[in-house]
Amino acid sequence: MRVAVSGAAGRMGRLVVKNAVAEGLKVVQAFDINEVGKDAGELAGVGKIGVPIEDDISKLDADVLIDFTTAEAAMKNAEVAAEKGVRVVMGTTGFTDEDRKRLAELAEKVPMIVSPNFSLGVNIFWKIVEYAAKMLYEWDAEIVELHHRHKRDSPSGTALKLAEIIRKVKEEKGIEADLKTCREGISPRESEIGVFGIRGGDVVGEHTVFFFGSGERIELTHRAMSRECFAIGAVRAAKWIAKVDKPGFYTMDDFLE
């Protein structure tokens, strides 16, 4: 199985290269606008693999592309991959609704798995939160997420998915709940789901969902201790999508099932 990695010089990209090599996959291309010409394996700490970093995605030639870049770059990369018939594992976040619509259109050409978080723990966490939301749909729900100071998007894609899970459950129970990403001044709490992002230091990622009842509350938390969990999940998703013949917009639920 031939794998290309876009964003290969970044924090996540290096870990993807490292774990792809560890899983016995053949990394054949590595794309980034930084560290051009350097060996992707050396950057990943696994020694030379004979794959230099290049910055021209139009040269893409692989079975699967694993993307951890920026939303803008990822959209271009997905366009090229779809045109060339290359399957896509998309770990980039920060997409607009229009971007997601376009990704779904591109997925009509090639199998594509898109997730704001490839960690197995987070995907189980989503299921736990959904179960709790069904039991506690009348309770107030708030989400707080913490990430390192360099994270580009806020709230995180993982937090937004948590909010969407809770919103859908409430909607099924006849409760309208809007997403609230900031509050200012003093006002009564309306039917809403608050999502708040904190940025600082080198926090890999932490998400806490609060359910507030009368005289009690439940807190559910997932903490990523290392980015390794995201890379491992993405590489395993790549091995899965490589065996999928039917084009489509797949999620981690499809992979886990």
Swiss-Prot record:
Question: What does it do?
Answer: Catalyzes the conversion of 4-hydroxy-tetrahydrodipicolinate (HTPA) to tetrahydrodipicolinate.
**Coiled-coil region:** none
Q: Which UniProt keywords apply?
A: Amino-acid biosynthesis, Cytoplasm, Diaminopimelate biosynthesis, Lysine biosynthesis, NAD, NADP, Oxidoreductase
What residues sit in the active site? H147 (proton donor/acceptor), K151 (proton donor)
InterPro entries, alphabetically? DapB_C, DapB_N, DapB_N_CS, DHDPR_bac, NAD(P)-bd_dom_sf
**Signal peptide coordinates:** none
This one is known as 4-hydroxy-tetrahydrodipicolinate reductase
Q: Which reaction does it catalyse?
A: (S)-2,3,4,5-tetrahydrodipicolinate + NAD(+) + H2O = (2S,4S)-4-hydroxy-2,3,4,5-tetrahydrodipicolinate + NADH + H(+); (S)-2,3,4,5-tetrahydrodipicolinate + NADP(+) + H2O = (2S,4S)-4-hydroxy-2,3,4,5-tetrahydrodipicolinate + NADPH + H(+)
Q: Specify the pathway.
A: Amino-acid biosynthesis; L-lysine biosynthesis via DAP pathway; (S)-tetrahydrodipicolinate from L-aspartate: step 4/4
EC numbers, comma separated: 1.17.1.8
User: Can you tell me which residues bind NAD(+)?
Assistant: G7, A8, A9, G10, R11, M12, D32, G91, T92, T93, S115, P116, N117, F118
Taxonomic superkingdom: Archaea
BP-aspect Gene Ontology terms: diaminopimelate biosynthetic process; lysine biosynthetic process via diaminopimelate
Q: Which organism is it from?
A: Archaeoglobus fulgidus (strain ATCC 49558 / DSM 4304 / JCM 9628 / NBRC 100126 / VC-16)
What is a GO molecular function of this protein? NADP binding
What family name appears in the similarity comment?
Belongs to the DapB family.
| Localization terms from the record | Cytoplasm
List GO terms (cellular component aspect): cytoplasm
List where the protein spans the membrane.
none
Q: Where does (S)-2,3,4,5-tetrahydrodipicolinate bind?
A: H148, G157, T158
Tell me which Pfam families the record gives.
DapB_C, DapB_N
